[in-house]
Amino acid sequence: MSMTVSEKILARASGKDRVEAGEIVMADIDVAMTHDLTGPLSVESFRAIGEDRVWDPEKIVVIFDHQVPADSIEAAQNHMIMRDFVEEQGIRNFYDVREGVCHQVLPEKGHVVPGEVVVGTDSHTCTHGALGAFATGIGSTDMAMVFATGKLWFRVPETLRFDVRGKLREHVYAKDVILNIIGRVGADGATYMACEFAGETVAEMSVSDRMVLSNMAIEMGGKTGIVEPDEKTLNYVRRRSGKPWRVFKTDPDAPSLSVMEVDVSDLEPQVACPHNVDNVKPVTEVEGTEIDQVFLGSCTNGRLSDLRDAAAILKNRKVSDSVRMLVIPASREVYRRALDEGLIEIFVDAGALVCNPCCGPCLGGHVGLVGPGEVSLSTSNRNFRGRQGSPEAEVYLSSAAVAAASAVKGSITHPGSLK
């Protein structure tokens, strides 16, 4: 029987020859990730079910990124809980406050390879599907069961493949592609589906750009966002991981597969407008909207390629006096390479604030929140009310290039319009 890549991975993990969409399976977990914000509840739930030892400390990864450094006594206590837990359980894959955002650090450190089942107590765990894994977010109670047993049940999802074709125009990036797709599909248009990204345009993208697509699959309700592994994928994991991998491909006649054709050849930069991610418009329709803050970072667009795109625009230019620009590299490795390439110097000279690698204002709780009536333009993935501070603020989402150009202009701007 023909299957999709997601079905093949879940079949492998559950010890079956085949699975079908809608079937309930009990799958072995290859990687279990938690962080400083959701980890303590996972630990509490683990204790509550009477367990003393995790099933396999080598398959558990703990990363501090949400409240880094601790911004309150409660956050400091959460950090202490997790530090004690990793020491008690012998968890070696522990990344304290210095490393960066979990969805950048996890693949960077070689913890994800094709063919794996990856779970994390964060909704954007779907990011790691860009490496050909079945990756999805779970709750802290589910993670407690994973800690205890190394297994978790799944309902096998149907697959919606986005066949993306066409050459991207100047100033158009992966972020514009995924925003356009979400705008067309809707915030709940792919609920509990495996969103598969394919086609010639995706094949031309770097692994970092593919991560942008997978990262935002959850914003249309997707269970995961997955890209079939190719040589780019394997080159990425070869440099970072010594783990074995398995390459699975979708059979074109798989019964649960539906396909949506996406032509991006005429696409222009996109902006998600308040207060929903699927409220997407071309940048030209919102150009001139005044902004108070620009946030360049997050697990969506805080990678080196994003910093390069922004720095190319900011070089020999200044951030508008009316704008606060925050630059938050997604990881220490990204920060270090940006330093080596002179990108940090460009940001500082332009008048941006460069912060330590962390989630920043994305979760609305740390580093650079916005106040009532203020407008933020962000390269992150969500713009719900209160997402970056006050529920009376407005948050727009864009690519790094649009964010940088807008920081210079003081209002939402097409990068091509800067003189």
Swiss-Prot record:
Cofactor: [4Fe-4S] cluster
Annotated metabolic or biological route of this protein: Amino-acid biosynthesis; L-leucine biosynthesis; L-leucine from 3-methyl-2-oxobutanoate: step 2/4
Enzyme Commission number(s) from the entry: 4.2.1.33
Catalysed reaction equations from the record: (2R,3S)-3-isopropylmalate = (2S)-2-isopropylmalate
Keyword Chloroplast: no
Protein keywords: 4Fe-4S, Amino-acid biosynthesis, Branched-chain amino acid biosynthesis, Iron, Iron-sulfur, Leucine biosynthesis, Lyase, Metal-binding
Binding site for [4Fe-4S] cluster: C299, C359, C362
Cofactor notes: Binds 1 [4Fe-4S] cluster per subunit.
Superkingdom of origin: Archaea
UniProt GO BP: L-leucine biosynthetic process
Keyword Iron-sulfur recorded: yes
Catalytic class of the enzyme: lyase
GO molecular function, one term: metal ion binding
InterPro entries assigned to the protein according to its UniProt record, in alphabetical order: Acnase/IPM_dHydase_lsu_aba_1/3, Acoase/IPM_deHydtase_lsu_aba, Aconitase_4Fe-4S_BS, Aconitase_4Fe-4S_dom, HAcnase/IPMdehydase_lsu_prok, Homoacnase/IPMdehydase_lsu, IPM_dehydratase_rel_enz, IPMI_cat
Subunit (UniProt): Heterodimer of LeuC and LeuD.
Family matches, as NCBIfam families: hacA_fam, HacA_Meth, IPMI_arch, PRK00402.1
Similarity comment: Belongs to the aconitase/IPM isomerase family. LeuC type 2 subfamily.
Function per UniProt: Catalyzes the isomerization between 2-isopropylmalate and 3-isopropylmalate, via the formation of 2-isopropylmaleate.
Name this polypeptide is given: Probable 3-isopropylmalate dehydratase large subunit
Organism (species): Methanothermobacter thermautotrophicus (strain ATCC 29096 / DSM 1053 / JCM 10044 / NBRC 100330 / Delta H)
